[in-house]
Amino acid sequence: MHDIKSIRDNPQDFDAALTRRGLSPLSSQLLAIDERRRAAILASEQAQARRNAASREIGEAKKAKDEGRASALMEEVAKLKTTMPELEAAAKQADEELARELSAIPNLPLDEVPDGKDEHDNVERHVFGARRNYAFAPKAHDDIGTALGMDFESAAKLSGARFVVLKKGLARLERAIGQFMLDLHTTEHGYTEVNPPLLVRNDVMFGTGQLPKFEDDQFWAVRGELLIAPDERLKAERLGLIPTAEVALTNLVRESIVDEKELPMRLTALTPCFRAEAGAAGRDTRGMIRQHQFTKVELVSITTPETSKDEHERMLACAEEVLRRLDLHYRVITLCTGDMGFSSQKTYDIEVWMPGQGDGGAFREISSCSVCGDFQARRMDARYRASDGKPRFVHTLNGSGTAVGRALIAVMETYQQADGSIAVPDVLQPYMGGLKVVAADS
């Protein structure tokens, strides 16, 4: 959420930042609403002040036995009682209109973010490792997985498209990957493990930016009785399945003031995630690349404004370390202004090399690490008390550390062997009971 005072003070800078995002200038429209809002609030406050003053004057007039003046003042107060609800309603309506408009505007990019329209304008930052050479043509994970316990047919019977059932060694390997990531972040990177709810309220979804703009991308759960309730009640009482643990973890500080000494607050969770993928029709229809349900390790940091940029670099390094320990080839790119997420000021994507994808392999996203400034904090009313005693908005950051399903794909395709089995990376073998190969009989 944007600060209207900042827009009021720097309308040209605000519009310039929106233009970098590929949006039209909005400051004039917002400031016009703000002017109406401020005028309505002023009128309401003046009416309230006059009513209070007139009430005091009535007592003074009666004390002075000036019945004529007392009667006139009582008539004035009666009129104010009639008009005040209308003025208060107008002020509330203008306030809600401004909040509604502001809530639909994405975060503004930092100055160092490269300008661009889409993923083609993203900038490569660095590369780790190199592509492996194989004595055979590498296969895609879904071709390898059929014999190893990857079952899309059964999943379709249970839930429809974009779901998978994993069995035997593959189920164990996916669990091992998630546990390895969680252990790395909690024992070496200083994150606190959290096991959050998977169902959250509307205001929680709003806080991190999923609502109102991305309502159609969410899965919603409702109690049976609400299915026959009026739409307004259904919408108010529904719960959203988290599209990422970022939603729950970040909102742990909503509507609170934390002590500066508690920052940075670093949280991590391994959870299922649920996405409707409303805009992904026809994309990645094969395999596990794009699923309605997937597992992910999420990293969230709550910081002061002065430390958020450094924390962003630290978070990226933590996510990278996962892939380095797995010895996977990857690259880091800085997203351009036209490709960033709604709540982000700046985003790094980590793309892992998958040798079985496309024609000869491809880089695919496995992690996004974003700094959001105070954008989410304003939506959540999340603040910290600085050393001077004044409450200020925190800065929030989030990143995948990493997507477990896509890490499984990368391990399968990178460590595949000519006989169709998968060599288990050294770092995962302790989580696999010492198993070194996932084969059809594993």
From Swiss-Prot:
SUPFAM superfamilies: Class II aaRS and biotin synthetases, tRNA-binding arm. The keyword Iron-sulfur does not apply. Gene3D superfamilies: Bira Bifunctional Protein, Domain 2, Serine-tRNA synthetase, tRNA binding domain. L-serine binds at T244, A245, E246, E298, S400. HAMAP family: Ser_tRNA_synth_type1. It catalyses: tRNA(Ser) + L-serine + ATP = L-seryl-tRNA(Ser) + AMP + diphosphate + H(+); tRNA(Sec) + L-serine + ATP = L-seryl-tRNA(Sec) + AMP + diphosphate + H(+). Homodimer. The tRNA molecule binds across the dimer. It is an enzyme of class 6 (ligase). GO terms for biological process: selenocysteine biosynthetic process; seryl-tRNA aminoacylation. Coiled coil: none annotated. One of its GO terms (molecular function) is ATP binding. GO terms for cellular component: cytoplasm. This is Serine--tRNA ligase. Keywords: Aminoacyl-tRNA synthetase, ATP-binding, Cytoplasm, Ligase, Nucleotide-binding, Protein biosynthesis. PANTHER family: SERINE--TRNA LIGASE, SERYL-TRNA SYNTHETASE. NCBIfam families: serS. ATP binds at R275, A276, E277, E365, I366, S367, S368. InterPro entries: aa-tRNA-synt_IIb (IPR002314), aa-tRNA-synth_II (IPR006195), aa-tRNA-synth_II/BPL/LPL (IPR045864), Ser-tRNA-ligase_type_1 (IPR002317), Ser-tRNA-synth_1_N (IPR015866), SerRS_1_N_sf (IPR042103), SerRS_core (IPR033729), tRNA-bd_arm (IPR010978). It comes from the Bacteria. It is found in: Cytoplasm. Catalyzes the attachment of serine to tRNA(Ser). Is also able to aminoacylate tRNA(Sec) with serine, to form the misacylated tRNA L-seryl-tRNA(Sec), which will be further converted into selenocysteinyl-tRNA(Sec). CDD domains: SerRS_core (cd00770). Pathway: Aminoacyl-tRNA biosynthesis; selenocysteinyl-tRNA(Sec) biosynthesis; L-seryl-tRNA(Sec) from L-serine and tRNA(Sec): step 1/1. Its main location: cytoplasm. Belongs to the class-II aminoacyl-tRNA synthetase family. Type-1 seryl-tRNA synthetase subfamily.
